[in-house]
Amino acid sequence: MGEEENENDEVFEIVEKNPSFPEGDKAQTDWIQQNMRYPQSAKEKNIQGRVLVQVIVNKDGSIVEPKVLRSVDPDLDKEAIRLVSSMPKWIPGKNNGKEVRVHHSIVITFRLN
């Protein structure tokens, strides 16, 4: 990714077409479940919950700048950041028919069975 910045690098909050995980929401949920490493410390303390992570989905679909907006536990937060950082490229958001950078929130649900 280049260091050049111009007006086209603006990060949008609201766009005509939101970014999306390849193959949709169910595929995203399945991917998260398959790739999640539930922290042992959280298992031992029976900690569950939903971590809300905000990311930027770049024009090329890459996920950058993950930030926890709603925390459950430091170890779960760390795993949520690891998960979203390792996701495959998304379908980028669009505004006026062009790919744009978009802030997007992802909920990671940690549930013990």
Q: Can you name each region flagged by the protein language model?
A:
Residues 1-113:
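Charge-biased low-complexity segments
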